[in-house]
Amino acid sequence: NAGHNPLLVYKAKEIRVEEENVKGTAIGFLEGYKYKLGKIVLNEGDVLLYYTDGITEAENANKELFGIERLKRVLLENSYKSAQSIKEEILKEVDNFREGYEQVDDITLLVVKI
């Protein structure tokens, strides 16, 4: 994951969300850094979710963070939908969680449905 948040993988056959957490430095941070390659076996209906920390670190007025567990729950609850709909549901849930509190970090999502 090149120093970014863990990749979330919804496994349709097991009906669960896994965190693919690989250690490493951010892309471009260290010249000549050798990244490890990994392999994930995917099946029809599985979903890959790449996201920036603007999602998990989104705050509400009580200074609570949206967090990875909420993100995993939203992915699980919407896994039967299209990639576009999953993205929209995540953004809606983050917005509802913030309750109008300012979003100070960027949000980037990439949803891939197999």
Predicted regions span which residues?
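Conserved subregion of the PPM/PP2C metallophosphatase catalytic domain
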Residues: 1-114
